[in-house]
Each structure stands twice: as structure tokens, then as C-alpha cells.
Amino acid sequence: MSSYANHQALAGLTLGKSTDYRDTYDASLLQGVPRSLNRDPLGLKADNLPFHGTDIWTLYELSWLNAKGLPQVAVGHVELDYTSVNLIESKSFKLYLNSFNQTRFNNWDEVRQTLERDLSTCAQGKVSVALYRLDELEGQPIGHFNGTCIDDQDITIDNDEFTTDYLENATSGEKVVEETLVSHLLKSNCLITHQPDWGSIQIQYRGRQIDREKLLRYLVSFRHHNEFHEQCVERIFNDLLRFCQPEKLSVYARYTRRGGLDINPWRSNNDFVPSTTRLVRQ
């Protein structure tokens, strides 16, 4: 269990509780979770973070009414900046989006502006929103993470409790390498409900070579770890930076969707540009 799982800042969340679904617009349904909850225990300070990045959300179940009452549908792309005070809690995001279903808007841009305003207010940070018509995305190929997959290793896992022990002495030699490693075995659990969160992760770095077996064991140790997606990515970045001390590091995870939403956080200390094409499990 995370050290802050019972923090009072989480007590008011609708997550894990029975809730009524509203189909008329209500911005108050959105709920934020302070990023400081997991950053403070990691020693990360808002004014001196070792990374930049965004939380990329894809909205697959977005619908509203036009001015004449005709339903509209779109796929939304949201980017929430890492400097925001709060992350957006996903169940509240889903409930908020449902509140658009029977609400009339004059045009698509009004919907986009409403989303940007409300999400920015909840997160207390910078948010950008793009809406796509379905025909704009038809035929879009399934993407993949570039890099070397480290999953096919003949190893025995006898401990799947989270630990950073595997990263101790995980680098060898003085030779500097630059490589991209990928795993599809990332699985953590929701901080509140403990429901499973499934993801793929891409790690780009420049530095002393990281032992792939130790890295895989570390990633697998998240299997019973309870944190939100964004928190897990920041923990992984921080742990790799602390124990492996790469010159450059980027960590990007794309999680499978739940409730019509997928969350894809990335953190980097260099000029990393993430691919936003959905992966095969998304």
C-alpha cells in the first residue's frame, strides 16, 4: 500500500463509491488529486522537478447535442501539463464527460473550450484539448513502441511485491550507451479500488547500460503496487534516475482504457517527443 493511500485529500473522491450518473452538464463532477501526494515522499519539489512531460488522455466516449438537439460524437485528445497542482481523477472525468450527453452546445469549439476551461480549473494547470471527427481517425494504424522488448527472458519470479532493490547495482561498466527498452508487462493497481491497470512502457536513456533482467524484475514488482498511472510513471522515472543515474532519461507508459478513457503519461529530462498513436491493447 502506498504511504498516502489514506490521506485526507483522497477521502472526498467518488472513486470506489456508488454514484449517480448525470447527463446534463456539471463541471463540479471533476475531482483533482494533488500531485504532491506521491511527489513529496519521493523528495520531488514542484519548483525543482527533474523532468517535464504531460499526461495524455484519449476520450473515446464523448457525446453532446448540437444546437438543434442532434447528438454529436467525437474522440478527444487531452494533454495535461506536469506542472499542474492536481492530476485528474479518472472516474470523476468519466462522470463529467457523461454530463455532456444531453447538453446542447452551439458548436464543436464551444465543447473544446468548455473542456479546456473545466479541466484547467480542476487541475490548476495548463490543459490543451483537441476534438476529432470519426472520419478523421478512420484507418489510423495501430502503433507500437519503438525499442527492444525485454519481456522474453527465461527468468523465475519469486517475489512480485514492489521493491527498488532490483535497481541497486543495475548498471555495469563505464561505457555509455543510448538505447530504448520496452515492456508490455507493466501492471499496477488503482490507488483506491485496487482494480488492475494494464500498460506498456517505453524507457529511453543515455548512460551506463542497465541490466535488462534487473529492470524487468523491477517493473514486474509493480504488480501489486497501488498508485495512479501518473504516479507510477513518476516513481519509475525517479527510481531509474536515482539508482542508474543516466545522463538522459525518458519514461512513457500507455495504459489500456477504462470507462472510455485511456491515460498515457510521459516524463523526460531531454527533448523526448512521444508517439500518440494507440497501441494494440488500447
Swiss-Prot record:
The reaction(s) this protein catalyses: 7-aminomethyl-7-carbaguanine + 2 NADP(+) = 7-cyano-7-deazaguanine + 2 NADPH + 3 H(+)
EC code: 1.7.1.13
Keywords: Cytoplasm, NADP, Oxidoreductase, Queuosine biosynthesis
Major site of localization recorded for this protein: cytoplasm
Binding site for substrate: I88, E89, S90, H229, E230
GO cellular component, one term: cytoplasm
Gene Ontology MF annotations: preQ1 synthase activity
Active site: C190, D197
Pathway: tRNA modification; tRNA-queuosine biosynthesis
Disulfide bonds: none
GO BP terms in the entry: queuosine biosynthetic process; tRNA modification
Localization terms from the record: Cytoplasm
Domain of life: Bacteria
Pfam families (UniProt xref): QueF, QueF_N
Binding locations of NADPH: S90, K91, R258, G259
Similarity section: Belongs to the GTP cyclohydrolase I family. QueF type 2 subfamily.
Matching NCBIfam families: QueF
Oligomeric form and interacting partners: Homodimer.
Function: Catalyzes the NADPH-dependent reduction of 7-cyano-7-deazaguanine (preQ0) to 7-aminomethyl-7-deazaguanine (preQ1).
Protein name (Swiss-Prot/TrEMBL): NADPH-dependent 7-cyano-7-deazaguanine reductase
Organism name: Escherichia coli O127:H6 (strain E2348/69 / EPEC)
